[in-house]
Amino acid sequence: MAGLAATTALPETAVAPVVAERQASMKAMADAAKTISGIFDGKLAYDSAAFKAAAETIRRRSGKAMVDGFPAGSLGDPSAAKAEIEQSREEFNALAGHLESLAAALSSAADDAPDGITEAMRMAPGMAMGSSLLGKRAGGAAEAAPSKMPAEHLFHLILQDCTNCHAKFREKRQ
């Protein structure tokens, strides 16, 4: 019986570091998004290195890194990650990959604008934000390639991906 108790306790302690790491990763991405938002809103001075570093933080923590942070057996309590991630693994993985591609394009925008936010980085007036999960638009048309989008639009799509992922895969907690 003592051997059984030791065996059942092991997975719990093995999961805790994964949960802590992914929570730290999500916080780092949220902080990076606040930096980018502050730059676009004019609350922070434009600094191409800070802009790029923030976009790179999101890029490095999305894609495969994000997928690896949600292994089977680490979902549910004590984290807010829903077990539904496992049932919808393909969708979750695709969303993590989409986020990575958007963040990579956003990062490269800083290389093209070393001195300040350019008009090309800004969303055009009336530019539609109607993208849905994974860039699929109503009627089946896909969004433009991320490398062709203004940086501000990329950033809004990143935030939309975060919102979509949290709405589906994150348990609301008080």
Where are these regions (language model features)?
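N-terminal signal peptide c-region/cleavage motif recognized by signal peptidases
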Residues: A6-A9
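Short, surface-exposed loop/turn segments at secondary-structure junctions
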Residues: G42-F51
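Bacterial N-terminal signal peptides
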Residues: M1-L4
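Sequence context surrounding c-type heme c attachment/ligation sites in exported
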Residues: E12-K43, E56, R61-Q174
